[in-house]
C-alpha cells in the first residue's frame, strides 16, 4: 500500500517517538524529509539526523530532550495533499507569537518563516513546530 502523505507520517513518527521517549527514529528518506530534518536540527528541535544509504535510503533522526521532556511540544501538519496552503511573504504566520516556527517550502528551498520573511519570500506552509 502506498503512503498518501509521507510528510504527515514523518511528523507523526517524531511525535510518537518523543511520546515514547525514543532516542532515535527512522523512516524512508526523501529530499523534502531531509530538508525538513535539516531545519529542525538548525532550530534545535532535534539533536541530529543522518541518511543511511542502503538499497532503500533511510533517514534517522536523533530526538532531543530537555530535563527528560521532549523539546518539541507540538508539531502540526498544515498544507496537506488535499488542501495546499500557500502564503505570500506578508501573510506568513507567527507560531505562538514568534516562539515556534513555521516550516515553509519556498522557491529557494525549505526554511523557517523567519528566514522566508528576511528573504522576502512566500511559499507553501508545510507545518508548525513549537
UniProtKB/Swiss-Prot annotation:
SUPFAM superfamilies: Ribosomal protein S8. GO terms for cellular component: ribonucleoprotein complex; ribosome. The keyword rRNA-binding applies. PROSITE patterns: RIBOSOMAL_S8. It comes from the Bacteria. One of its GO terms (biological process) is translation. InterPro entries: Ribosomal_uS8, Ribosomal_uS8_CS, Ribosomal_uS8_sf. Keywords: Ribonucleoprotein, Ribosomal protein, RNA-binding, rRNA-binding. One of its GO terms (molecular function) is structural constituent of ribosome. The keyword Electron transport does not apply. Part of the 30S ribosomal subunit. Contacts proteins S5 and S12. Belongs to the universal ribosomal protein uS8 family. One of the primary rRNA binding proteins, it binds directly to 16S rRNA central domain where it helps coordinate assembly of the platform of the 30S subunit. PANTHER family: 40S RIBOSOMAL PROTEIN S15A. This is Small ribosomal subunit protein uS8. It comes from Haemophilus ducreyi (strain 35000HP / ATCC 700724).
Amino acid at each position: 500500500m502506498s503512503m498518501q502523505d509521507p510528510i504527515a507520517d514523518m511528523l507523526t513518527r517524531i511525535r510518537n517517538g518523543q511520546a515514547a521517549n525514543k532516542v532515535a527514529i527512522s523512516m524512508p528518506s526523501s529530499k523534502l524529509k531531509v530538508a525538513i530534518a535539516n531545519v529542525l536540527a538548525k532550530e534545535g528541535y532535534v539533536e541530529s539526523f543522518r541518511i543511511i544509504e542502503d538499497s532503500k535510503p533511510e533517514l534517522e533522526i536523533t530526538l532531543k530532550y530537555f530535563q527528560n521532556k521532549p523539546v518539541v511540544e507540538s508539531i502540526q501538519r498544515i498544507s496537506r495533499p488535499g488542501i495546499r496552503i500557500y502564503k505570500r511573504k506578508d501573510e506568513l504566520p507567527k507560531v505562538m507569537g514568534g516562539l515556534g516556527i513555521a516550516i515553509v517550502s519556498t522557491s529557494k528551498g525549505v526554511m523557517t518563516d523567519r528566514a522566508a520573511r528576511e528573504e522576502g519570500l512566500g511559499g507553501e506552509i508545510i507545518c508548525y513546530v513549537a
